[in-house]
């Protein structure tokens, strides 16, 4: 039986990511997608599609995963992971999509979609995962993809307002990319607890094996971080509790 034809009556939660592009969402989603009961569509947010019912949405995701990946093979963040032998193909308990920056942008530009999709279409509880990376690194990475420094700073904190709204009103957890890389077993277990799925030692070991050794500190790779820009970002960071403690 293919993924797309699996029963969806056991699905407990819909999973959505919130945050920014190039913040570690792809790595985080890939680790969860290793789990046999979690099915995540890469580069997808329900806010950018039009679905009339929950069943239509869930079946669409499962069918696209099967069609594009021939099972559970998916390309995440520049690497393709093997469908972990013995750990894939389980009953779907959590289904969702990963496009953290796209979700933040959609909520920023069209906030009424939030209620329309997450309250009116999706009837099962929605679980949110917010992936937080050092803002200086995340902003720097923006500038490597056609953003000017000041524009990158501006859009980053505009999206942060969308993140703040979700975290203050929805069933969510924050995962810091730096902590995930340092202690992948601990952070993956915490996310799975949030999603109500059991984990095994083999699954956690497999997750640990695909995580790189240290976060990329891209802020040191450019020369445009003036004192004024550093101070501006420092001031902005203080406005968001979930960014507390980050420094240049």
For each of these PLM feature ranges, what is it?
Residues 89-202, 224:
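PAPS-dependent sulfotransferase catalytic domain
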Residues 24-25, 134, 191, 233:
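Generic structural signal for small/hydrophobic residues in well-ordered secondary structure
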Residues 1-16, 143, 164, 193-248:
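PAPS-dependent sulfotransferases, especially Golgi type II membrane carbohydrate sulfotransferases
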Residues 40, 44, 50, 108, ...:
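Short linear functional motifs in flexible/disordered or boundary regions
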Residues 1-89, 206-221:
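PAPS-dependent sulfotransferase catalytic core
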Residues 60, 71-78, 100-123, 151-152, ...:
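Anion-recognition interface
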């Amino acid at each position: 039986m293919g993924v797309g034809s699996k029963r969806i009556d056991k699905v407990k939660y819909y999973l959505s990511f919130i945050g920014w592009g190039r913040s570690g969402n792809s790595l985080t989603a890939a680790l969860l997608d290793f789990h046999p009961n979690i099915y995540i569509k890469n580069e997808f947010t329900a806010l950018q599609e039009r679905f009339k019912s929950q069943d239509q949405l869930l079946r669409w995701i499962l069918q696209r995963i099967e069609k594009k990946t021939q099972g559970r093979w998916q390309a995440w963040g520049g690497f393709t992971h093997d469908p972990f032998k013995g750990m894939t193909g389980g009953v779907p308990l959590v289904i969702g999509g990963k496009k953290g920056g796209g979700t933040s942008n959609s909520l920023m530009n069209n906030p009424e979609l939030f209620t329309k999709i997450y309250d009116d279409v999706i009837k099962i509880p929605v679980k949110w995962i917010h992936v937080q990376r050092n803002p200086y690194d995340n902003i720097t990475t923006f500038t490597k993809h056609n953003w000017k420094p000041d524009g990158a700073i501006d859009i980053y904190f505009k999206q942060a307002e969308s993140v703040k709204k979700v975290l203050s009103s929805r069933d969510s957890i924050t995962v810091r990319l730096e902590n995930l890389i340092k202690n992948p077993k601990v952070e993956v277990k915490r996310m799975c607890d949030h999603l109500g799925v059991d984990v095994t030692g083999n699954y956690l070991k497999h997750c640990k094996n695909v995580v790189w050794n240290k976060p990329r500190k891209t802020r040191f790779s450019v020369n445009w971080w003036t004192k004024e820009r550093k101070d501006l970002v420092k001031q902005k960071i203080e406005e968001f509790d979930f960014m507390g403690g980050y420094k240049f």
